[in-house]
Amino acid sequence: MAKVIFLENCTFLIPTKIDSEDRKVNLTLVVDYLLKHFKTNIIIAEQDTESKVKSFFKWGSKVKHIFVPSTNDFFHKTRLLNIMIKAATTDVVVSYDSDIILPLNQYLDAFALLNSKQIHFAYPFNSRVYHIEKAQRGLFEKNLSLDDVGSHTTMKHPGVPPGGVLFMNKAEFAKCGYENENFKSWGAEDIERTVRIEKMGYAVARMNGLIFHLEHDRTPHSTDVNPHYKENENEFKKTVAMSKEEIENYIRSWRF
């Protein structure tokens, strides 16, 4: 039996909308992986007209499921994250995409850093994304171990991603306004958050290690052709141009 790692003062926040079979499979794999290896807290917030997660939810009291009814055609990730952050009762919260897997030591190292109060925000990786293609997903699923994936990955995108997984001190993130719900669908919400946190005077650590992505089909709302992409870019540019004082005033104007 695998050794369980205790991360009890930590809550993983997983926003989702099940718009394909891939999303269902990947969410299940991610939650199974976290529960196999960690004694921790997990919240899933699901946006949809009717819950699809309920039909395959198998984790009982180990996972909290929040259903957020919505007729919006876009995925409002930032709103779901804010709902989960406010529901979390731990000092450390983790913004966690529903298709990301990390080597185990990276979770532990990031949590230890935040739990020590040395730093309040940390990305637990510093590599380009390694993609686990759908055809290779079964290799991971068999034992829920990255050791089984080995070289069966691809690298498609240059640079280190600005999102995926971010460990955060909940109280300090509150001072930064939490998530910016002006972002809708996909585009720039992760990098805006990092820029805003840094402009508020905090360091955002990048820790050594890899990041793996479970591949999936994409709807137009998961790409830069979504109708909100330009507005998202403008929202990001607004944050980039602001001073700390201007950001503080802007946060006070938010009504979400």
Over which residues does each language-model region extend?
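Glycine-rich, basic loop-to-helix element that forms the pyrophosphate-binding segment
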Residues: 71-87
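Acidic donor-binding segment of Leloir-type glycosyltransferases
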Residues: 31-69
